[in-house]
From Swiss-Prot:
Family: Belongs to the intron maturase 2 family. MatK subfamily.
Pfam annotation, one family: MatK_N
Entry's Gene Ontology molecular function annotations: RNA binding
Protein name from the UniProt record: Maturase K
Record GO cellular component, one term: chloroplast
Keyword annotations: Chloroplast, mRNA processing, Plastid, RNA-binding, tRNA processing
Purpose of the protein: Usually encoded in the trnK tRNA gene intron. Probably assists in splicing its own and other chloroplast group II introns.
Subcellular localization: Plastid, Chloroplast
Domain of life the protein comes from: Eukaryota
GO biological process, one term: mRNA processing
Gene: matK
InterPro entries: Domain_X, Maturase_MatK, Maturase_MatK_N
Length: 499
């Protein structure tokens, strides 16, 4: 077991990253202002220059360490008469400074890892559309898929202790713990509630960093299990989790298959397991039997419960066959279907007809969720019937048309990788009629009269498809090349997906 400590132990060079002095540097708060704060609002609220503002922040941090929270008690109002300053504003200042400070060592590690791996151009790898070519290449050869929702929320104390294993700076994390318990409603960031706290809205960068770190820690352990699974046994695997000594807290894993398989407690080799994640949702896919998928399911559940002390619901993790079920990921419904192809071959005077069944990944636009989103944005009703957008009726005709066209371009750009474009045409048709009704409402006219007066050419851009542009560019090319550009196209310039 000593050989595996090499893979688990922490790089000792990271222990010398002291962050506490950075919190009291002017340029850290300047970076924070550039990222998340409005300097004019700061000047308006503070009435001081930058040095005086930083001095007040230092005094606030000093006051946080005192037992009598005279200034920043949660029971007090947002504005304390002793100081006369907004508590939420200063919590935002400190959180932005903490976020910038803590991100520095992780950014340096990321840059060094890219240099060691000799990855010079990683820009395209950041695109979320780069996931789908991976699906097209791997998933037709896989059999089972499982949707895994990463459980939350993790306890603050567990999160801070885990963070301390990476950066050995006790002062910073004493301040971090005190600040989180004093100001933050950590659950409000990642708990699906209608009401989001003021802190979550004004400090998304800081809390998103904490959540992403939790996911990164979970994935580092999961990938270790994935890469070393063929060499470890559950009966003697006391080296997993404590990120300093790694020799404790593993007896819970013995209970995974202890009841059904008391004599078979080995990790099974699974070279075909694939893992993909975006934000809090991940996909596990494998070529092997459902038993191995079930094994990984219970490993993850025990990992969350025993190491992170996060409750996970096993009943919500379903294992499905790719050929029979679709999985929802990044706004697409994807499944693997059989694509029959008939090949006729002739040998001398005899001809043969051979039928081959090829597996192909289908990516389908989820029409019903999109219509619900359009209905929520007041472009149509719940049945998909277009309605006018009265909020935009005060804008100019050019601005109204440009807004609708921009939405259509974004949807077409993102969903151009769909196998079936009819759903996209329907969405664009809804937006087209909604635009016409909005213009008619503005001019106090009917849709028919408005179109008759201006002509249907006014909105013909709604149906200008990107593949038509490609066909114009490659008009002299071969028919095979034209057919290629009429198919699915994945763009590597899309870095975010808004629900």
């Amino acid at each position: 077991m000593e050989e595996f400590q090499v893979y688990l132990e922490l790089d000792r060079s990271r222990q010398h990253d002291f962050l506490y002095p950075l919190i009291f540097r002017e340029y850290i708060f300047a970076l924070a202002y550039d990222h998340g704060l409005n300097s004019s609002i700061l000047v308006q609220n503070l009435g001081y220059d930058n040095k005086s503002s930083l001095l007040i922040v230092k005094r606030l941090i000093t006051r946080m360490y005192q037992q009598n929270h005279l200034i920043i008690s949660a029971n007090n109002s947002n504005k304390n008469p002793f100081w006369g300053y907004n508590k939420n504003l200063y919590s935002q200042i400190i959180s932005e400074g903490l976020a910038v400070s803590v991100e520095i060592p992780f950014s340096l590690q990321f840059i060094s890892s890219l240099e060691k791996a000799e990855i010079i151009k990683s820009y395209n790898l950041r695109s979320i559309h780069s996931i789908f070519p991976f699906f097209e290449e791997k998933f037709p050869y896989l059999n089972y898929v499982s949707d895994v929702q990463i459980p939350y929320p993790i306890h603050l104390e567990i999160l801070i202790q885990t963070l301390r294993y990476w950066v050995k700076d006790a002062s910073s994390f004493h301040l971090l713990r005190l600040f989180l318990y004093e100001y933050c409603n950590w659950n409000s960031l990642i708990t699906p509630k209608k009401r989001i706290s003021t802190f979550s809205k004004s400090n998304p960068r800081f809390l998103l960093f904490l959540y992403n770190f939790y996911v990164c820690e979970y994935e580092s352990i999961f990938l270790f299990l994935r890469n070393k699974s063929s060499y470890l046994r559950l009966t003697s695997s006391g080296v997993f989790f404590e990120r300093i000594y790694f020799y404790a807290k593993i007896e819970h894993f013995v209970e995974v298959f202890d009841k059904d398989f008391p004599s078979t407690l080995w990790f099974f080799k699974d070279p075909f397991i694939h893992y993909v994640r975006y934000q809090g949702k991940s996909i596990l896919a494998s070529k092997n039997t459902p038993f191995l998928m079930k094994k990984w399911k219970y490993y993850l559940i025990h990992l969350w419960q025993c190491h992170f002390f996060v409750w996970s619901q096993p009943g919500k993790i379903h294992i499905n066959q790719l050929s029979e079920h679709s999985f929802d990921f990044l706004g697409y419904f994807s499944n693997v279907r059989l694509n029959p192809s008939v090949v006729r071959s002739q040998m001398l005077e005899k001809s043969f007809i051979m039928e081959n069944l090829l597996k192909k990944l289908d990516t389908i636009i989820p029409i019903i969720p999109l219509i619900r989103s359009l209905a929520k944005a007041k472009f149509c009703n719940v049945l998909g019937h277009p309605i006018s957008k009265p909020v935009w009726a005060d804008s100019s005709d050019f601005d109204i048309i440009d807004r609708f066209l921009q939405i259509c371009r974004d949807l077409s750009h993102y969903y151009n990788g769909s196998s079936k474009k009819k759903s996209l045409y329907r969405i664009k048709y809804i937006l087209r009629l909604s635009c016409i009704k909005t213009l008619a409402r503005k001019h106090k006219s009917t849709v028919r009269v408005f179109l008759k007066r201006l002509g249907s050419e006014l909105l013909e851009e709604f149906f200008t498809e990107e593949e038509e542009i490609f066909s114009l560019i490659f008009s002299r090319a071969s028919s095979t090349l034209q057919k290629l550009y009429r198919g699915r196209i994945w763009y590597l310039d899309i870095f975010d997906f808004h629900q």
